[in-house]
Amino acid sequence: MGSSFGHLFRISTFGESHGGGVGVIVDGCPPRLAIDIEAVQAELDRRKPGQSKITTPRKEDDRVEALSGLLDGVSLGTPIAMVVRNKDQRPGDYKEMQVAFRPSHADATYQSKYGIQARSGGGRASARETIGRVAAGAIAKQMLRQLHGTEVLAWVKRIHTLEANIDPAVPTLDAVESNIVRCPDAAMAEQMIERIESIGRDGDSCGGVIECVVRRPPTGLGMPVFDKLEADLAKAVMSLPATKGFEIGSGFAGTTLLGSQHNDAFLPTSDGSLHTATNNSGGIQGGISNGEPIVLRVAFKPTATIRKEQQTINASGEATTLAAKGRHDPCVLPRAVPMVEAMVALVLADHALRQRGQCG
């Protein structure tokens, strides 16, 4: 329960951080699509640990194995199973956390719900669970690009109190990947890196905001009233670890505008397609995509597992303290960029198939 996502383009992830491996089954991918497994690997490389001085030092190759659903790089229309083996587990780092709950982590709520949990490495609450999502999202990206010419791109917009002012129409993948924090503003990226390093040296952590744009999305995605596109996007990205907020288009800032300022005026086009003068709606109106770029932002909290001593309780409810050991990200944002892209791509792929099924 709770490990599957989607309707027609449906995924199920499996595995724990310190188990034998993690992976995903993708069901519903159309047949006869060219699927580049190295493109899947490239996405996993963007999210893997140990990639820079501001991420966890855990060393994992995160090499993906495609077990089914592909033949000579072409989708068969049958379930695509992919797995990544875990290799660098250190259960000993979690001895203290097996008797004391990490504040603001899933340890306590998992124990309360199930009466048992895989505390070593965080189990299903670990960010390693997102390997399956990123692998599946890479398949969804390839489908969207081939069938609709759609691009999904995200970047770090804010780290702690440092925020970059970025026009969503400008960033490229090369610009995002040009630095280890994945912020396309090079000057701001340097400040962000220094901030993460400083906070990490103090044994603490920080959060921030990731912005994502969908360029050339199909028109008509989304269904009234409970399957609105932005509602499904919100559910998708808010299911990622450490997420605490979501906004689309003008978001909360739009509440300060008047209707005459916020409304996106329609403009005539030669082909009769929808086009607006502004994009405060973020590419979605009435829960349905209008063809303009979809722009959304996701807030991530500071990493819960930190080296600073904190007050907590043990499994018996007794007061204790915890200074966590192990290898943990001082900031999840740089590695979360491909995770956000993956979840957005999965929603769009699913809705594209649903739109084709209902409306042709």
Curated annotation (Swiss-Prot):
The keyword Flavoprotein applies. GO terms for molecular function: chorismate synthase activity; FMN binding. FMN binds at R124, A125, S126, G286, K301, P302, T303, A304, T305, R327. Coiled coil: none annotated. SUPFAM superfamilies: Chorismate synthase, AroC. Reduced FMN (FMNH(2)). This is Chorismate synthase. It comes from Synechococcus sp. (strain RCC307).
